[in-house]
A protein has these predicted regions:
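Membrane-interfacial, low-structure loops and terminal tails that flank and connect transmembrane helices
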Residues: 1, 120-151
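Membrane-interfacial catalytic/cofactor-binding modules of polytopic membrane enzymes
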Residues: 7-65, 133
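Hydrophobic residues within the alpha-helical transmembrane core of Major Facilitator Superfamily
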Residues: 15-18, 70, 91, 166
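Hydrophobic/aromatic-rich, well-ordered segments within soluble, folded domains that form packed cores
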Residues: 12-15, 19-22, 67, 183-196
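Membrane-water interface signatures at transmembrane helix termini and the short loops
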Residues: 57-116, 172-177, 181
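Hydrophobic cores of alpha-helical transmembrane segments in multi-pass inner/ER membrane proteins
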Residues: 1, 9, 13, 105-128
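Membrane-interface segments at or immediately adjacent to transmembrane helices
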Residues: 158-198
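Membrane-interfacial loop-to-transmembrane-helix junctions in polytopic alpha-helical membrane proteins
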Residues: 2-5, 47-57, 78, 146, ...
């Protein structure tokens, strides 16, 4: 339950980011081309990234990445390749765009899609055994005695939070005009890379 609750906003961010990219400037490659060109301005790659085919590739691959990555990382057969693509995507964004800590945070939070015990696979057996012995001595209650399920009140509050996260990103639809230009309803709508006007 708790792990799915943490995965939900991450998935929502990716999917709503993909939905936000379904617009003419992004799909035609104009917005991604301007962003990439600005990010690599003055480098030897600047002329190459301004090619229309490269801009289209960036636009469409970014859109597909946003829609597919949460589900590809959740599904065990595609998890490793999906995580590798997330590492490349977020590392690229960190170095090319000025969007602060978001790419690194998103990269680390992508590990939420793995099984809960995945870190154990990387820890040597002798360390696991020592940790287990120490933990068993310190623990006052057995896991069977702990109530790991949320109360009805907490479920109600969490349901309201989920509803808000589902609805608020679409409030821009109630403002007349094109959100990309007037930016009404832009905040909290997962439209981070779409403020570039072309």
């Amino acid at each position: 339950f708790w792990l799915w609750l943490l995965r939900f906003p991450m998935t929502l961010g990716y999917v709503y980011g993909g939905i936000a990219k379904i617009e003419p400037d992004w799909l035609s490659g104009k917005a991604p081309g301007a962003l990439i060109g600005k990010g690599l301005e003055g480098t030897f790659l600047e002329a190459w990234v301004r090619l229309p085919s490269v801009s289209l590739f960036y636009g469409w691959s970014g859109l597909l990445f946003d829609f597919l990555i949460p589900f590809a990382v959740l599904w065990k057969p595609t998890r490793k390749i999906a995580f590798l693509s997330a590492v490349l995507f977020h590392t690229h964004n960190y170095f090319v765009f000025s969007i602060g800590i978001f790419p690194l945070l998103a990269l680390f939070l992508t590990t939420l899609y793995f099984e809960p015990d995945f870190p154990e696979q990387w820890i040597p057996q002798w360390i696991k055994q020592q940790w287990s012995n120490w933990y068993c001595k310190k623990r006052k209650k057995s896991l069977k005695e702990l109530n790991l399920y949320p109360s009805k009140g907490l479920v109600s509050v969490l349901s309201l939070l989920i509803l808000i996260q589902l609805v608020v990103p679409f409030r821009h639809l109630f403002y007349p005009g094109w959100t990309v230009w007037h930016e009404e309803g832009h905040w909290f709508a997962w439209r981070m890379m779409l403020r570039q006007k072309t």
